Every structure is written in structure tokens, then in C-alpha cells.
Amino acid sequence: MCIRDSAIAFLVDAAALASQQAVFKVCSYGPYRRILKRIITEEGFHMRFGEERMLRIAEGTDFQREMFQQSIDDWWWPSLQLFGPDSRPDDVLLRWHIKSERNEVLRFQWVQKFVPLLHDYGFTVPDPGLTFDSEEGHWISGPIDWTPLEPVSYTHLTLPTILLV
């Protein structure tokens, strides 16, 4: 596995896993819930493998660390975008118990986990708007550019299409 793939496994697969676990937690649609159990197992393996690789790279050469940092720079924003824009107040997937958490809550929890991890191993987060709220004790990410995702926006999809995505 190359260094770039390690960053993808560490960041993107972890975001996918968090999103899928939120669906699995309360999903009322049996066939989807059953297949998610297998998918979550697989995504968990990928995320743990990426984390293990990140730990090794953190102790590696300067060149390896620079390559991993470049991959973090490339994949940070797509990882945040994976959660989707903030959920609508009338989110049908929440109302029908297809998922358990709002997109912004999942994204917030993911940031709380991964910013400290990256910092602890000497990597930087490529978010110029990232701040730490010392009163609340949590990280606040900067604004997300949704422009690259507009062609596949959920506002243009029907419910059956969303379930297949």
C-alpha cells in the first residue's frame, strides 16, 4: 500500500465508517441494515490498517512524512464532504429512522477525533479556518466548499437513489 492509500484509508474510510455506523445504529430497513453489518466490518478493517500505517509513517523518514502530509492535504476536505452538507430540519432519512445522526453532528464528532490524532503525530490539518474553542473544549472546522459536489447534490436525488448511493 502506498503512502497516499494510507491517508485515504485513515481519513476517508474512517469518515465512511462513522457515517455507516450512524445508519446501522437505528436503520429500520432490514435489507440495508443486514448488508451494512458486512460493510462496516470491511470499512473498520481499512480504517485500522490506515491508522497503523499512519503510526509507522509518523516514525518514518522526513520524505515519508512529507508524502503523508501531502495526502492529508489532498484528502482532508473530501473526508469532511463525505458526511454531506448540514442535514435539513425535515431530513427524511432521520424521520424514517434510516440514519441516527444529523450530518453536521457526525462531521463534528469526526473532527474531534481526527484533529488531535493528526496533531499528536506531528501532522497539520489543512484547514485555515480550524479553531479550538477552549471554553467548550472542541475543534471547529472552517467553512466547507461544496462546489465540487454540486453535480451530485442530494437535493437533486430521490429517496430510492439516495439509498443506492
Where do the PLM segments sit?
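Extended, helix-rich structural scaffolds rather than catalytic motifs
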Residues: 65-157
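Alpha-helical transition-metal enzyme core signature, strongest for iron centers
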Residues: 9-17, 36-50, 75-79
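Hydrophobic/aromatic-lined pockets within catalytic cores
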Residues: 24-28, 44, 48-62, 76, ...
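Inter-helical turn/loop segments and adjacent helix faces that build the functional surface
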Residues: 20-38, 52-67, 90, 94
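Conserved small/polar residues in nucleotide/adenosyl-binding loops
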Residues: 1-5, 155-161
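Alpha-helical bundle segments that constitute or directly flank the non-heme di-iron/ferroxidase center
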Residues: 3-26, 80-84
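Amphipathic, non-membrane alpha-helical segments in soluble helical-bundle scaffolds
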Residues: 3-13, 33, 65, 69, ...
